[in-house]
Amino acid sequence: MLFRSGMAETGELINIDGNGNRVASSLYGHKKVWFIVGRNKLAPTYEEALWRARNIAAPKNAQRLGRKTPCAVHGDRCYDCKSPERICRGLVVLWEAVANMEMEVVLIDQDLGY
């Protein structure tokens, strides 16, 4: 079961990750993966979902982790920094299920995470 950084109403699943463990597990190694998506993670388009993941979810997560990055300090947006404490080093966008893996999206009518 994985939590997403964002999802577009057009179907794209977006995950931003710092060390690759969350994005890797969404791509390989499991027979079935459930993606849990709260209503706050939904955006109308792919572009808006990606913007939300980078500029809302990632800065809040960096703050939660106590990182010394521009986004955590200011809390307002992604600065595309090169900080060694950067939490957004990898991006995976899923347009559909990966070959040989069953995927299911569970939409929850609550705000979940950032």
Region annotations inferred by a language model:
Residues 15-23:
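Active-site glycine-rich loop that binds ribose-phosphate moieties when present
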Residues 24, 28-114:
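Internal alpha/beta core interface subdomains
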